[in-house]
Amino acid sequence: MEQAPNDNGPQREPYTEWLLDILEEIKQEAVKHFPRPILQGVGNWVFTIYGDSWEGVQELIKILQRALFTHYRHGCIHSRIGS
């Protein structure tokens, strides 16, 4: 009978820690490209919908990723994307 191989790789950090690390990186990048009031509004909207939950963190990451990609693709003079 087939068996899954043993996991001998390095230990991964917990998913929640990884989410918080990713959110922090994306927030730092977003602050460089978007006005703070807009980012605060998005954060407040996500908090209103999802509360203080991991689903809210995931949704905020998705929104900021899409906003940054669109910004890079269509208008950021510092980006090589779309050049």
UniProtKB/Swiss-Prot annotation:
Its main location: virion. It is found in: Virion; Host nucleus. The lineage of its organism: Viruses, Riboviria, Pararnavirae, Artverviricota, Revtraviricetes. Keywords: Activator, AIDS, Cell cycle, Host nucleus, Host-virus interaction, Phosphoprotein, Transcription, Transcription regulation, Viral penetration into host nucleus, Virion, Virus entry into host cell. The keyword Phosphoprotein applies. Pfam families: VPR. This is Protein Vpr. One of its GO terms (cellular component) is virion component. InterPro entries: RetroV_VpR/X (IPR000012). The modification Phosphoserine is found at S79. Stimulates gene expression driven by the HIV-2 LTR. Prevents infected cells from undergoing mitosis and proliferating, by inducing arrest or delay in the G2 phase of the cell cycle. Cell cycle arrest creates a favorable environment for maximizing viral expression and production. Transmembrane segments: none annotated. Gene3D superfamilies: 6.10.210.10, VpR/VpX protein, C-terminal domain.
